[in-house]
Amino acid sequence: MYCLSEAVIYVNGEFIPKSEAKISVFDEGITHGWAVYEGIRVYEGRILELDAHLNRLYASAKGAGIAIPIEQSEFRRAVLDTVVTNEYRNCHIAPWVGYGELGGEPSVVIRIVERSSRMGEHATSMVSSIRRAAPDSIPAQIKTNSRLDLMLAKIEASLAGVDYAIMLDNVGYVAEASLANIMIVKNGVTLTPYPINALEGVTRNLILRLLPMRGYEAFEDNITLHDLWTCDEAFVCGTGAEVRPIVKVDGRTIGDGETGPVTEKVIQLYTDYIITHGEEVDYSS
């Protein structure tokens, strides 16, 4: 039995109270950031895009040279069991796989925290002085623990008193926000950067699928600073970020400073998708 006053964490096949959960300090995931991870959300007992997240986790691990020691189907069951064990109906789940000690097995950890939704809350931003790592240096499609560029940008945003840092790529185009994808709207058309210097987000891809199904144009494109500063609407999206309108960039008001009509539609489509396509967690199992 577990005391549910604290979260129970999955660690290498066992469920352990958060205060007792541990892995080796010699794990390369800790000593050198040689680890991959995911972020998954549960809303009112519905888990969203679980298989898409696990597909990316296994692809990231392969790209990073980490051999996940369990089959994807077993990992899937472990994620669901983590939710059920904690009895959380609104939460954020973070599967993490570290390379392990040299010569040893990789570590598999599934963290979980209760989290309420911030969907639709206004956010402010700034263009960061930190550039996103070049794709020929650190491939953006590997969701790795070693994301120092993103964290430095996040710190910069925090010190500036804004919610998100918007990072440029090594050429000068908009890449992504700190720990979220970014989309802008110009003349009713939704644009998002190519997934070259930006993570190909699960939420991002979902929005790119949903908008055309409702008659809205949505494309990948190069986005300049001028595009960003002069767009009609902007929003960040991601599993953690959800969908939040960006109402200011570098102190400049985007549109009329309110949630734009396309962004409102995105929030509606995303919320409806959670209800219609979120996988119901069986808490009786």
Protein language model features and the residues they cover:
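Ordered, amphipathic secondary-structure segments that act as subunit-interaction surfaces
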Residues: 85-96
